[in-house]
């Protein structure tokens, strides 16, 4: 508070009226109160700086955001957002959920590293590329392996009949994505290498435009892009990843967020697993709920339901070893600059026990 200039002096003078004396006394009282308030505010500020208060401890404090990737697919994560159960669980902890959309897995993990996202949901490959770049991520949970919802598309009138026919052709996919990985495996099964095709790295929206304009010969992509293009008679499915995939998706976070908020992560995984179970058992209701999200009609979504395998599974040595195989594959292809020890991103069994839902742990 700025210093007050001047000096108050009371003289014993007949001119000093009772009124002027009261005015002066009133001003002094106001000054005293103001200085006292300033001093109290200063002390409170110092105390707050010395002893930070949790956002959950005061109803007047703005809630802290937990930023989670938004899913626009037929997934339990999309259902979780629509139903709002996570928000109800986290509110007493002082957290507000913000759902944020990203083009694909690699973009999510870039945001995770830049402190623009707290919880990501990706396939197996994006975390490997992030670890190769030195990102200190943490694998939180994984799902059952399911590749039927990822398809290798060709134009509806394309002469391409088999994967071997892709030799020398332009194939679009998001770099470092599940589409990239399954293309590698599909080509190997057909006796080809990735270098036998012309790779066109495009994010899903850009690849969709290029594919519909016949600027590429094939496209490896996930739902709902595949079904939309089939419905519009733009594409047909050459192959899917059903027999090629032996790892599930991963939920991940930054090491910093995990260490600061294990309670939030535990609540998230509990609500997610409940939603996984509900989604599996209610295909009709899920189709109605997610029709606006996926831009597909409910009957189509009901048919797509069987392309997914629902439920979290425990992170075990088998899961870690399978993920190491993915990392070793990318290194052998020269697509990551160094060997990655994926174990650096996994927690200890004791740490997983603290955050993993009990019914998931029971499936070990």
Language model segments and positions:
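N-terminal secretory signal peptides that target proteins for export/translocation
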Residues: 1-17
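N-terminal export leaders
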Residues: 18-23
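C-terminal motif of bacterial Sec signal peptides marking the signal peptidase cleavage site
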Residues: 33-37
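Bacterial signal peptide processing site
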Residues: 39-42
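Short, glycine-/small- and polar/acidic-enriched structural segments
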Residues: 46-193, 199-201, 217-221
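Pocket-lining segment of extracytoplasmic ligand-binding domains
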Residues: 125, 199-200, 205-292
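Secondary-structure end/capping motifs
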Residues: 260-337
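Conserved C-terminal helix/tail region of periplasmic/extracytoplasmic solute-binding proteins
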Residues: 328-364
């Amino acid at each position: 508070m700025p210093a007050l200039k001047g000096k108050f002096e009371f003289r014993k003078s007949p001119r000093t009226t009772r009124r002027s004396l009261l005015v002066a006394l009133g001003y002094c009282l106001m000054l005293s109160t103001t200085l006292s308030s300033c001093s109290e505010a200063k002390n409170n500020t110092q105390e707050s700086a010395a002893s930070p208060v949790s956002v959950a401890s005061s109803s007047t404090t703005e809630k802290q955001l937990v930023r989670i990737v938004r899913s626009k697919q037929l997934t339990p994560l999309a259902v979780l957002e629509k139903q709002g159960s996570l928000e109800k669980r986290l509110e007493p902890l002082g957290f507000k959920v913000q759902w944020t959309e990203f083009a694909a897995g690699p973009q999510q993990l870039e945001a995770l590293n830049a402190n623009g996202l707290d919880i990501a949901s990706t396939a197996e490959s994006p975390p490997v590329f992030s670890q190769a770049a030195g990102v200190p991520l943490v694998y939180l949970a994984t799902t059952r392996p399911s590749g039927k919802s990822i398809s290798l598309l060709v134009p509806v009138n394309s002469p391409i009949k088999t994967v071997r026919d892709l030799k020398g052709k332009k194939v679009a996919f998001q770099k470092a994505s599940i589409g990239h990985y399954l293309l590698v495996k599909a080509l190997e099964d057909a006796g080809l290498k990735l270098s036998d095709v012309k790779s066109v790295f495009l994010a899903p929206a850009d690849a969709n435009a290029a594919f519909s304009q016949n600027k590429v010969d094939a496209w490896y992509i996930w739902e709902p892009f595949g079904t939309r293009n089939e419905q519009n008679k733009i594409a047909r499915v050459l192959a899917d990843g059903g027999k090629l995939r032996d790892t599930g998706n991963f939920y991940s976070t930054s090491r910093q967020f995990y260490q600061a908020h294990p309670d939030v992560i535990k609540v998230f995984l509990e609500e997610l697993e409940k939603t996984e179970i509900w989604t599996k058992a209610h295909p009709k209701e899920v189709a109605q709920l997610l029709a606006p999200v996926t831009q597909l009609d409910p009957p189509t979504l009901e048919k797509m339901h069987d392309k997914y395998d629902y439920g979290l599974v425990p992170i075990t040595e088998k899961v870690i070893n399978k993920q190491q195989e993915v990392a070793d594959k990318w290194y052998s292809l020269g697509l990551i600059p160094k060997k990655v020890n994926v174990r650096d991103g996994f927690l200890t069994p004791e740490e997983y026990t603290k955050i993993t839902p009990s019914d998931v742990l029971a499936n070990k």
